[in-house]
Amino acid sequence: MTLEKTNRMNYLIDFYQALLTPKQRNYMSLYYLDDYSLGEIAEEFEVSRQAVYDNIKRTETMLEQYEEKLALFEKFEQRQQLLQTLKRQVELTDDVSATISALENLE
């Protein structure tokens, strides 16, 4: 599993966890946030490894469907990019203001 997929799933879990059942939340939290293996989760809940795998895959699909319809993560990423752009613009404005002040204060 790639780091990018793990990060995406962590965000989707954060955004859509209220739409998941308690069992789905538990499995996803243990698997993605706490880095449990399928076997460890199966042992914890006294179910088969295959049952855990199937539940996680179904939940991943559900989370992607929620994101497709609601786009909370996509909008979050867009806000983050715009915020970074705004911060750079403010820094440039501060630099320009300082240069103008320096020019005005020259004798």
UniProtKB/Swiss-Prot annotation:
Domain of life (superkingdom): Bacteria
Pfam families documented for this protein: UPF0122 (PF04297)
PANTHER family the record matches: UPF0122 PROTEIN CBO2450/CLC_2298, UPF0122 PROTEIN YLXM
Family statement drawn from the similarity comment of this UniProt entry: Belongs to the UPF0122 family.
Task performed by this protein: Might take part in the signal recognition particle (SRP) pathway. This is inferred from the conservation of its genetic proximity to ftsY/ffh. May be a regulatory protein.
Family matches, as NCBIfam families: PRK00118.1-4, PRK00118.1-6, YlxM
Identification of the protein by name: UPF0122 protein EAT1b_2891
Origin species: Exiguobacterium sp. (strain ATCC BAA-1283 / AT1b)
